A protein has these predicted regions:
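Intrinsic-disorder-associated, low-complexity terminal segments enriched in Asp/Asn/His/Tyr and depleted
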Residues: 7-8
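Catalytic cores of DNA base-excision repair glycosylases
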Residues: 17-233
Length: 234
């Protein structure tokens, strides 16, 4: 079959309707990542919550190296509250920001016990009340632990959405608003993972040639290519 590149290179990017562009992006991502895996290893909502919290300013690979020792020590909130914060900090030190993250892990474990019967809450509002849990972390847990449609925006999604002309890139909050308006709700969870994997493997921040990218080659406008070039030249 003819590749998307050949089909759409001649199409005016500005003339292409947002929904048409979104449909073509979905088709490419579905072909490339039909069953996108969740990058963070976990066994249940609690282990996912902790893993996502640890992933702030840290790679998923590093988190997956650290969490087995942490969960061997305390796989549940009940056991985690009995682990001294300093011990948690020592285990998670390779993930960075260990003082803040250790305090958050201990604190949220106590709240889960005291206020949620030891269970991770399945609402965005309750998750965001937990220490160390922001909107993105809560959204990831909602999507990947509970299957609730969510579009958490990380650095890869933020970058790709800007390159593809799906958002102006002013903030991750704006990017999330733009993407949930653009894609069908039932696709958000898969697309979140698909765009992350595409960003990591094909559309990286550095050493990226739009002409060789199966999406940027037709979706990225000349103006955005020029703007990215200027930023790199600084």
């Amino acid at each position: 079959t003819t590749g998307w590149n050949e089909d759409y290179n001649a199409v005016s990017v500005t003339a292409m309707k947002r929904q048409d562009k979104a449909a073509r992006i979905q088709a490419i991502l579905d072909e490339r990542f039909p069953k996108p895996p969740i990058p963070l290893d976990h066994q249940d909502p609690f282990s996912l919550l902790i893993a996502v919290l640890l992933s702030a300013q840290c790679t998923d690979v590093r988190v997956n190296q650290v969490t087995p020792a942490l969960f061997a020590r305390a796989p549940t909130p009940e056991l985690m509250v009995d682990v001294p914060v300093e011990e948690i900090r020592a285990i998670i030190r390779p993930c960075g920001l260990s003082p803040q993250k250790a305090k958050a892990i201990s604190g949220l474990s106590r709240i889960l016990l005291d206020e949620h019967d030891g269970e991770v809450p399945n609402t965005l509002a309750e998750l965001e009340k937990l220490p160390g849990v922001g909107h993105k972390t809560a959204s990831v847990v909602m999507a990947q632990a509970f299957g609730v449609p969510s579009m958490p925006v990380d650095t890869h999604i933020h970058r790709c959405a800007w390159r593809w002309g799906l958002s102006n890139g002013r903030s991750v909050e704006q990017t999330e608003r733009d993407l949930v308006r653009t894609f069908p709700k039932e696709r958000w969870n898969d697309l979140h993972l698909q765009i992350i994997w595409f960003g990591r493997t094909t559309c990286p921040a550095m050493r990226h040639d739009p002409e060789q990218c199966t999406i940027c080659s037709w979706a990225m406008s000349k103006a955005r290519r020029a703007e990215e070039k200027r930023k790199r030249a600084r």
